[in-house]
């Protein structure tokens, strides 16, 4: 079928023309140090966009990916860029442009963290900082440079940011960038790059001006559309237990323990300190629990996760960091020892991917101070959290 113009597609959506999926990082044939960095960063398996977009980028295709934030897109292009560069070549080989300073700095942090074992230097070129500092940093030839369009264009024109070794040009949040009036700078940057530079464009929406960039500057691009997986509270019974004061939560949990271990449960606390404290207290009462949070070494987290997945550990105490990372499809009970500090995390803790259609029970410990937050959560998700019945064990 002839490639139909992207312009004909309905309401700013692109149509995928690439269906290959690589569902583990191990199968991506990444450099050993990079793979180590990916796992150390806390990833266990690739998200939908990572499964689809990393391989074509590594293989050298131009890629258009339509994906919302929260889908794992930053890591998608960071991993790809780290795989493609030669760390020993002191010259810019991958250039990433983002619409805001904050986003550029965030991307830089991700690149440095995932590239930790490759000793990669990644420089952020952003407005509002001294040009002198940029010039000095760029003279050292960092292999990956990330920045905002104005400053990047300026640095290339001054010949401080050299483009002769450039292999990869990544535009993140292209729709944002063009709607903020950076079109001219973006076009200028394209003109200043070597003809053969591979182009990767990421955008949540595909308005006309973004499509024009893809037609003008991209060669036969792979198109990937990733819809954000909708989490749902459907099929999940939500209860609360009124706890007069914080100190009583521990006894409440101990009373529930028999019920809890009928199946596997995840217990969420709001801080790492609380996770450690609760783990100690429960262990002292001879309850078997495992704990996991961001302060732990990745290898340790992997072991705990493996034990939990295999069912040899039944109760996992964790922080929100893991709410998004734990594939808790097999978990039918979640206890919020602390209500989440922000309501968005509530659905990450207890929600389920619609296609799994899993049943489940969530129990929220609620002190007088938490009532307002609970009402907010109910309103935000248009859901009902009811007082826990006596026969909760029958529902799990």
UniProtKB/Swiss-Prot annotation:
Reactions listed under catalytic activity: ATP + H2O = ADP + phosphate + H(+)
GO CC annotations on file: cytoplasm
Short sequence motif named Q motif, residue ranges: 23-51
Assigned EC number: 3.6.4.13
InterPro entries: DEAD/DEAH_box_helicase_dom, EIF4A_DEADc, Helicase_ATP-bd, Helicase_C-like, P-loop_NTPase, RNA-helicase_DEAD-box_CS, RNA_helicase_DEAD_Q_motif
GO terms of molecular function: ATP binding; ATP hydrolysis activity; RNA binding; RNA helicase activity; translation initiation factor activity
Domain Helicase C-terminal residue range list: 235-396
Assembly and binders: Component of the eIF4F complex, which composition varies with external and internal environmental conditions. It is composed of at least eIF4A, eIF4E and eIF4G.
Family the UniProt entry places it in: Belongs to the DEAD box helicase family. eIF4A subfamily.
Identification of the protein by name: ATP-dependent RNA helicase eIF4A
Organism for this UniProt entry: Aspergillus terreus (strain NIH 2624 / FGSC A1156)
Protein encoded by which gene: tif1
